[in-house]
């Protein structure tokens, strides 16, 4: 199996052509292509030429992330064409992955897929991330990666990072050098513009 994520852990996105090329190689060698869609709601509304239809066309299985889009739990697994393995539902049950009262997970996706809510709340993350990105640029911060998604990777002085820890939640990513660290700021469906403004004021 070939396993890819869209968006990736680094906040990057595949292009439609890249997805088509990977799919072509996988199909030539009869290797299933799996797309991790934990952040799919953010990837679909970021600046990209990849649509949900493209993902369905080029992959054998993907999942639509729920927890990163406001659901209490659950992801929606989608098998394309006739790619679902034999006895898949039985295997799910035998391996302890079938939730009792699983319809409660389904109800969340029913709500998320109504009136494009899934995409609308994804837009909030992208819009707030764009404001954060622009504000950081204006303050002279360096970016480790140019991400069009809700994940922004910023190089901070170690001293500034330690100060920021007192008031802000963010992810340590890796050391840039002895005096600088790369951190990740991630916006979400719930991020407010005032949250972004507060963060920028602390930087």
Give the label of every model feature segment.
Residues 1-37:
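Active-site phosphate-binding strand-loop segment of PLP-dependent enzymes
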Residues 1-13, 51-139, 144-148:
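Active-site C-terminal subdomain of aminotransferase-like
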Residues 2, 22, 35-36, 76, ...:
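Buried hydrophobic positions in well-ordered alpha/beta secondary-structure cores of metabolic enzymes
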Residues 8, 39-41, 68, 191:
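Active-site-proximal loop/turn and secondary-structure-junction residues that shape catalytic pockets
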Residues 16-24, 28, 39-61:
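Active-site pre-lysine segment of PLP-dependent enzymes
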Residues 19, 78-81, 93-94, 168-170, ...:
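Short, solvent-exposed amphipathic alpha-helical segments in soluble enzyme
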Residues 19-23, 129, 200:
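Generic structural signal for well-ordered alpha-helices
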Residues 130-131, 135-203:
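Conserved C-terminal alpha-helix-loop-beta "cap" of PLP-dependent enzymes
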């Amino acid at each position: 199996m070939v396993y890819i994520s869209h968006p990736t852990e680094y906040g990057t996105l595949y292009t439609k052509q890249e997805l088509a090329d990977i799919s072509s190689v996988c199909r030539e060698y009869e290797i299933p292509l799996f797309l991790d869609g934990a952040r799919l709601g953010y990837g679909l509304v970021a600046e990209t030429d990849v649509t949900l239809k493209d993902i369905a066309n080029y992959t054998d299985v993907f999942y639509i992330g729920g927890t990163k889009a406001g659901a209490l739990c659950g992801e929606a697994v989608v098998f394309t064409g006739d790619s679902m393995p034999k006895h898949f539902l039985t295997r799910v049950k035998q391996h302890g992955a079938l939730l009792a009262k699983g319809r409660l997970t389904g109800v969340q996706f029913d709500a998320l897929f109504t009136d494009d809510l899934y995409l609308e709340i994804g837009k909030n993350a992208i819009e707030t991330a764009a404001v954060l990105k622009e504000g950081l640029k204006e303050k002279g911060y360096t970016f480790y990666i140019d991400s069009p998604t809700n994940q922004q990777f910023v190089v901070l002085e170690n001293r500034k990072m330690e100060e920021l820890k007192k008031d802000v939640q963010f992810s340590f990513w890796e050391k840039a050098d002895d005096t600088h660290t790369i951190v990740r700021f991630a916006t979400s469906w719930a991020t407010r513009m005032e949250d972004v403004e507060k963060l920028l004021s602390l930087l």
